[in-house]
């Protein structure tokens, strides 16, 4: 409650009290009489000093108008005295015998209205207080005041609110393009309806926290040009039974009155959680609310013109009935940005801030792999706060570097005092991590190593990937195991006993090894089997109270395989440190003197360290002998072998406005329909142009004679076999060309990397949390065509009347240079998984020091 509201309430109470006092004052006709004792009034009656008298029987008082005032009445001639009910006859006799000129007796009787008011008024006051308290508990009761418990709390955005557009969104270009189509459908429905297209009824934005799901919804609100209602999923859950379902009904009734419109439900997992039996046979109020939401989204009634946009970071717990097409037709993953996205986000958040021209934002974008947009905004803000703390005027490279360390590891513990021996142990511990990682061939080089205490760690070593990756091989995971055990091995090698500082390293190594055995099938003994399926009661978090789906013998073998992996990594780390003991001592000496070493320093110190061979102890394929035949080469590698120049990616995708000439074929491009005859259409009906080849090196496609031998038995056939020679038609979001060798592109609307379905054994530390939420989605891979080359740049001439979401040249770029690029074969679309010893760093691998806490 603010100060203005308090002042208003106090003033209202004061006015009411003043009115009551004024009413009682002016309605009292005895205010001119002096109240005296009963004995004084009787003495005046006995002295016959009374001119007139009036007896008020109900009030049991007598009014006397005296002939002369005296000392007993303080000179007043109008006096008032009270008397008991038993003395009424005596007072009447006294007045009658006083010889007054006149006297009167008034008997006041209550009216029926007064009696009713005296009975009802206290009840009205009590009910008023009750409803006031309930109104305060319900936050105003929503629409309808006190009786509006069942009314919707959805708020309609007005023109006075700050407007966010798609130009303010950076690092989520695919999500922007998907949502822009909805905005274009609302503003230009004719060209979609001419093709029989229907607008998506629901759009689900899912992904980890801080990636911009709510920001995308605000951008849709600023661009749509239709009524926009926003509500939180928790607003449906109240203390009364049935309130949630009633609010859902009222929200959609409100939306129908403003159709066409958009409803945005933030954190829909609060109401859309998967239904279950309930514990103890009880009733869950969320189920009733969810059932009403399902009916309103796609039930018997009409819902034309209402688009529901929802956001969640827990798609795995949503009810399958809520995710089916017809309710949420489009499910858009919003993951962590890639390198180009991080560049754009840093440009947006650094706009308007005095950044030093020598500050390397490009390098900062490379060092922050896996960070979300919120993390990057926090990095820039922390750098500004650090600069202000030091009374600086320009944000320098050092401030940006320190801000990254603060966001990843926490603030420095400058006041911590440690002994020289503990400092030496920390130096060797972090040096062991660094040297082990430097000698392994399948791990990113160490970017920074420090023994400064930060957050809950006594030191850490960071590895930064050179580029974004979405896959991890077995040798890479073993290399991370070796790095994790490097600190423990250094303590045992130098000080002949381990310390508690390696607890977080052991925890990280155990997680990696167990994931290799149980999730990724990287154990030759147990095979490619997933042990420990996710499931269980949704009310128990899907993991509590659920028995393992494997036997005790398998559990014992899993433990043995995990231990063997960690022991092999421990032995390898010991061998590396023992072989390069001089380099380990040199790293420890430099850390004791300088406390922090960067990659440039490490390159000088570890110049003589050679890469170790890959560990093959666990590469047991059984009777399956790997082939010596190398994999096929990419179109880029083939072009380089032929001496041709591979074209650089274009600066931006081609966005052609409706009605523009030659909208189906870009200028200077060669129409390509896969060698099939032209049917007369200017372009594909889905709005995506066929890929074009740079001239004059476009390949000539020649038919392949005969049918290739696929190794099927003679005379054997099946539906769809043998495969057709002609390529299958493409689908929206797919590339028309495929990699030589038949690697399938990613299906549309399917997330890659960390928050999508893994491809070809992609590691997933928490695959269920941000996996594909809809189990019924299918991929439609494209059949490779012989002779087809991968295009240099995917070309999307989407015909939007206003030029599309990327028509603004200054979008996400304060300098005015348009650097947005659609993904290419050389530009991965997803960030690599985090390689962190404690599994809490958002961007880099951190191997903590021996402080005993992590």
Curated annotation (Swiss-Prot):
Chain residue ranges for the region called Disordered: 658-854
Ranges of compositional bias, category Polar residues: 812-822
Binding-site positions, Zn(2+): 429, 433, 505
GO CC, any one term: plasma membrane
Root EC class: hydrolase
UniProt similarity note: In the central section; belongs to the AAA ATPase family. In the C-terminal section; belongs to the peptidase M41 family.
Free-text function comment from the UniProt entry: Acts as a processive, ATP-dependent zinc metallopeptidase for both cytoplasmic and membrane proteins. Plays a role in the quality control of integral membrane proteins.
PANTHER family: ATP-DEPENDENT ZINC METALLOPROTEASE YME1L1, METALLOPROTEASE M41 FTSH
Protein name: ATP-dependent zinc metalloprotease FtsH
Organism whose genome encodes this protein: Rhodococcus erythropolis (strain PR4 / NBRC 100887)
Gene: ftsH
């Amino acid at each position: 409650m603010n100060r203005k509201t308090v002042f208003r309430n106090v003033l209202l109470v004061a006015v009411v009290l003043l009115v009551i006092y004024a009413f009682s004052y002016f309605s009292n006709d005895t205010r001119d009489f002096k109240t005296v004792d009963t004995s004084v009034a009787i003495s005046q009656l006995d002295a016959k000093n009374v001119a007139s008298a009036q007896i008020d029987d109900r009030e049991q008082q007598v009014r006397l108008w005296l002939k002369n005032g005296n000392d007993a009445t303080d000179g007043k001639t109008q006096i008032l005295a009270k008397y008991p009910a038993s003395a009424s006859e005596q007072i009447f006799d006294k007045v009658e015998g006083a010889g007054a000129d006149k006297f009167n007796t008034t008997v006041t009787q209550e009216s029926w209205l007064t009696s009713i008011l005296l009975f009802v008024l206290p009840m009205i006051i009590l009910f008023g207080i009750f409803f006031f308290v309930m109104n305060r508990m319900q936050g105003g009761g929503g629409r309808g005041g006190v009786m509006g418990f069942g009314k919707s709390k959805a708020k309609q955005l007005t023109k006075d609110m700050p407007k966010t557009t798609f130009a303010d969104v950076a690092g989520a270009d695919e999500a922007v393009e998907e949502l822009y189509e909805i905005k274009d459908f609302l503003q230009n429905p004719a060209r979609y309806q001419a093709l029989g297209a229907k607008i998506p009824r629901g759009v689900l934005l899912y992904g980890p926290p801080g990636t911009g799901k709510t920001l995308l919804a605000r951008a849709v609100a600023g661009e749509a040009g239709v009524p926009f209602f926003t509500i939180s999923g928790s607003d449906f859950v109240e203390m009364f039974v049935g309130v949630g379902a009633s609010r859902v009904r009222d929200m959609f009734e409100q939306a129908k009155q403003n159709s066409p419109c958009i409803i945005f439900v933030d954190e829909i997992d609060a109401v859309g959680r998967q239904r279950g039996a309930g514990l103890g046979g009880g009733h869950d109020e969320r189920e009733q609310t969810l059932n009403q939401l399902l009916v309103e989204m796609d039930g018997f009634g009409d819902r034309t013109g209402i688009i529901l946009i929802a956001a969640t970071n827990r798609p795995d717990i949503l009810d399958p009935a809520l995710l089916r097409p017809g309710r949420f037709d489009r499910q858009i993953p919003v993951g962590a940005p890639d390198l180009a996205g991080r560049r754009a986000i840093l440009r947006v958040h650094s706009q308007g801030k005095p950044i030093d021209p020598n500050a390397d934002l490009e390098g900062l974008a490379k060092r922050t792999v896996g960070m979300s947009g919120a993390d990057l905004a926090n990095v820039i803000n922390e750098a500004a706060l650090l600069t202000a703390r030091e009374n600086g005027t320009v944000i320098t490279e050092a401030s940006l570097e320190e801000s990254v360390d603060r966001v990843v590891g926490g603030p420095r513990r400058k006041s911590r005092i440690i002994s020289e021996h503990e400092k030496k142990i920390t130096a060797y511990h972090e040096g062991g991590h660094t040297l082990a990682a430097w000698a392994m061939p399948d791990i990113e080089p160490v970017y920074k190593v420090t023994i400064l205490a930060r957050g809950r760690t006594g030191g850490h070593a960071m590895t930064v990937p050179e580029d974004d990756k979405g896959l991890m091989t077995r040798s890479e995971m073993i290399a991370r195991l070796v790095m994790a055990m490097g600190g423990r091995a250094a303590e045992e090698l130098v000080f002949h006993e381990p310390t508690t500082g390696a607890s977080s390293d052991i925890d990280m190594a155990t997680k990696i090894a167990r994931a290799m055995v149980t999730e990724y099938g990287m154990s030759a003994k147990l095979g490619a089997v997933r042990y420990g399926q996710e499931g269980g009661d949704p009310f128990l978090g899907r993991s509590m109270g659920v028995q393992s789906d494997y036997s005790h013998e398998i559990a014992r073998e899993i433990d043995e395989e995990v231990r063997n992996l960690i022991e092999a990594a421990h032995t390898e780390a010991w061998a590396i440190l023992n072989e390069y003991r001089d380099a380990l001592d040199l790293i420890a000496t430099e850390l004791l003197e300088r406390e922090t070493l960067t990659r440039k320093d490490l390159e000088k110190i570890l110049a003589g360290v050679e890469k170790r061979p890959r560990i093959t102890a666990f590469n047991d394929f059984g009777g399956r002998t790997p082939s010596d035949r190398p994999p096929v080469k990419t179109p880029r590698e083939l072009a380089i072998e032929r001496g041709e120049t591979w074209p650089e990616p274009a600066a931006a995708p081609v966005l052609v406005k409706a009605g523009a000439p030659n909208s189906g074929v870009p200028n200077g491009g060669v129409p390509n329909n896969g060698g099939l005859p032209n049917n007369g259409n200017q372009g594909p009906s889905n709005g995506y142009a066929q890929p074009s080849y740079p001239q004059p090196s476009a390949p000539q496609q020649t038919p392949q004679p005969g049918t290739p031998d696929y190794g099927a038995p003679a005379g054997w056939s099946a539906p769809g076999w043998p495969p057709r020679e002609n390529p299958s038609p493409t689908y929206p979001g797919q590339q028309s060309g495929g990699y030589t060798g038949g690697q399938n592109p990613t299906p549309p609307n399917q997330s890659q990397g960390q928050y999508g379905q893994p491809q070809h054994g992609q590691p997933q530390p928490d695959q269920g949390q941000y996996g594909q939420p809809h189990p019924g989605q299918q991929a439609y891979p494209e059949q490779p065509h012989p002779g087809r080359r991968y295009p240099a740049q995917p070309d999307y001439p989407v015909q939007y009347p206003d030029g599309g979401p990327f028509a603004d040249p200054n979008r996400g770029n304060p300098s005015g240079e348009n650097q947005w690029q659609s993904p290419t074969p050389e530009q991965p679309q997803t960030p690599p998984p985090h390689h962190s010893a404690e599994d809490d760093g958002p961007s880099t691998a951190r191997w903590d020091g021996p402080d005993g806490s992590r």
